[in-house]
Amino acid sequence: MKKVVYSIKKVRGNSDDKISGLGFLNEEGTLLCRCVSKTGKPYTRAFDDVEQHCFPVFGKENEYKGYVTMYYEYEGRDIEVEYSIWYKTI
């Protein structure tokens, strides 16, 4: 596992929500982020195939940037959400 600093933001919509902090990138290329719910309960959020979809930032060492599309099911509907992801290995 690699330790990373990350920043994740939704691409579409009016959402200004940004997730950032310290996380881990496992051997399969999944970014694991520690989060806290609105009720204060901790949980781990996983973003699959981040290592595949992110590419090195030109002129920066150990920094990567890209887009990941995730699919969720909500009340019988499939929802597509695209995230802009930046991370730096430390």
Task: Locate each region found by the language model.
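A short beta-strand micro-motif
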Residues: 3-11
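Acidic, low-complexity, intrinsically disordered interaction modules
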Residues: 25-82
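Compositionally biased, intrinsically disordered low-complexity regions used as flexible
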Residues: 1-2, 57
